[in-house]
């Protein structure tokens, strides 16, 4: 099962508090493991403009302002921009299932600071990673639901409402979710 481009929706049974009510877009998945970005946990004390300032990247008056998220517990000092596929940095952008791009180089930050770049984007500090078979085991254990990732929800500014919104998009009332998995 290749979950690249899928959205993981944390179930109430999620044992790891870092992923409680999280949505994770899986950017890469293979027999060697998986890598994804949490898309609904903003970093409250860091703005995109503040990050550009720290990196000495000048921001034009029409420069873009995108939300900065905590992408996961791995390498929190490393930044990733998840974006619409209308922007490609040669040799640096990874296309995710044809629906998203992920770029981790300074050129996309400079483009956004100039008011250019992709039409939709969010910044993630760090990432979520799984070793071989680990994600599959978590899905089987009922830690995560998986679904196709709607672009409009991924790039929505309503971070607190994304988890509930995704469940409702799937036809699931969040109040009916159980924290225990059944076995048929």
Swiss-Prot record:
Gene Ontology CC: cytosol
Name by which UniProt lists this protein: UPF0301 protein Rsph17029_2659
A Pfam family of this chain: DUF179
Entry similarity comment: Belongs to the UPF0301 (AlgH) family.
Source domain of life: Bacteria
